[in-house]
Amino acid sequence: MPLGDRLTKWERRVTMVPYQAIFFDFDYTLGDATPSILAGFAYGLDQLGWPAPDADEIRRTVGYPLEESYTKLTGDRDPIHREQFRAYFTQAAQARQREEAVLLPGATELLRWLGQKGVKRAVVSTKRADTLRGILEHRGVANQFEVVLGGDDVSNSKPD
């Protein structure tokens, strides 16, 4: 769909209901960090003696806190293993995410257009806030958000 059509669709929604703010998730909404996420999972699982599941199985856990994703993939609920997995994942993926994560087509234009319309924008994610900010800065859109909130900024990143 051409950018103009996407903006027209958004413009209709924004003018029909005067939104004051829009909250975006990052993964698969604004951007895609799949290569670094897959690398982090592969490394973390390998370090704990688990085979890496296929990429689609890992993708289905994106958006959950890492410890929960680990348990979904392995069945292991041991809190020590879950914390170790987080540390291994972060070691392998964090630096790569800034470089490898990309914005989805039209995301930058949409964020700028919403800003021109006076709509405040926030991005919320289970990613660590510093990782998320690094990605947004590297992609040149950090200034498009009034609020950046990572999973480490809250006590329960996926409340019921």
Can you say where each PLM-predicted feature lies in the sequence?
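N-terminal helical cap/lid subdomain that shapes the substrate entry/recognition surface
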Residues: 17-108, 112-117, 138
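Substrate-recognition "cap/lid" segment bordering the active-site pocket of phosphatases
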Residues: 100, 128-160
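Non-catalytic pre-domain segments flanking phosphatase-related domains
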Residues: 1-24
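Feature targets compositionally biased, intrinsically disordered low-complexity regions
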Residues: 3-5, 9-10, 39, 105, ...
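Generic low-complexity segments that are intrinsically disordered, proline-rich and/or Lys/Arg-biased
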Residues: 3-4, 9, 52-54, 80, ...
